[in-house]
């Protein structure tokens, strides 16, 4: 990456001398301000080029300035599919693969959630899992039509969406459309926002979820690096125990004002560091990032 090579040179870092973890921690962090917006986009990519690769662009929200466009290739989609494979195996009784309808209700368009979720589930289907996908995005009519007309053809439904939007669908489905969620074998995949255990309990009560630890999971992801981590049964258990145990809460969350997401990651995909109260990420993308201050 010519841009990163220049960044290291300007910061007087000799990459050949970075041999140990301690050495690595001396490398200056990068951010949108000091790195991504300082170089032409192509200079941030492998071999300094964008136009000779099969890429998909995703935009940041632009909430803190102009949107930044991250290119990605199929590697990030594949990493996400590994997390989803673990999730689908967790919800499979006796490891038998159930026929599954995936309703992808994340926003489509330039945002990462909808498309990367579709692509990751599609990869799983191509690996032999009996998965069928529909992508209504945030179109409520299409979501309710999918539940009413398609869900009954499958042994289980995985509903994927932004937590507040998922709650809207569950409430409106019951109150306006007369859907009996407890008759559906529904599972949930969330992303884009942390939520409380009260929220999780609410969905359990509304939908009759049988296994709180296996039947729903929140993904920690970003436009920058895709799906970076996911809740697992053990992380959900630890989080729920911490709600009622101040000592455990302090150990896990170091005095946070509200309960954060607790997720697990694959160190073969990404690395996390805690630095002065913020998170630094190192991970692969078509635009690789080393000690990147993601803003969390």
For each of these PLM feature ranges, what is it?
Residues 106-110:
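Conserved AMP-binding
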Residues 126-295:
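Active-site glycine/GP-rich loop and adjacent strand/helix microenvironment
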Residues 113-117, 199-202:
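Residues at alpha-helix caps and immediate loop-helix transition turns in enzyme cores, especially N-
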Residues 8, 121, 173-174:
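Hydrophobic alpha-helix position signal
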Residues 75-84, 111-114, 136-139, 161-165:
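Phosphate/oxyanion-binding active-site loops and adjacent basic polyanion-contact surfaces
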Residues 114-128:
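Conserved short alpha-helical elements in the N-terminal third of ANL/AMP-binding
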Residues 1-100, 104, 149, 153-154, ...:
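Nucleotide 5′-phosphate-binding alpha/beta core
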